[in-house]
Amino acid sequence: MSKILIIEDEEPIRRVLVRILSDEDSGFEIQEASDGKKGIDLIKKESFDLVLCDIKMPKIDGIELLQRTRKTNTSLPFIMLTGHGNIETAVESMKLGAYDFISKPPDLNRLINSVRNALEKKELVTENKILRQKVA
């Protein structure tokens, strides 16, 4: 079961994301944080397979959260969400290693596909690393 952290300050959006991704057939375990500070604290304490993160949040915004996380964890996939979708923010988040950038309100099929693809890529990278160690 993949463990996903949703960091979103807007409660109605967070509730929708949790409901969609915690569908009984999804195979996802969901945790949530209402701001960037709570999100970074959870990332430090627990292991996640994916982070779904809003960009504009109080205390610590999504870009800063991504930057801080990348200092200690370069492999944790991030999907960035924003209601203020501009190209500069998308480019900045992708340069920092975000897997995807999705405008709010998200197209649900696109969101689910992006989550599944990010998790699949993470799994393949992990398998590749293990195989390389066996060969070496």
Regions found by a protein language model. Give the residues of each.
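Receiver (REC) domain active-site loop signature in two-component systems and cognate sites
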Residues: 57
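Helix N-cap/capping motif at the beta->alpha junctions
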Residues: 32-41, 62
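Active-site residues of response regulator receiver
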Residues: 54, 82
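Two-component/phosphorelay signaling modules centered on CheY-like receiver
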Residues: 11-31
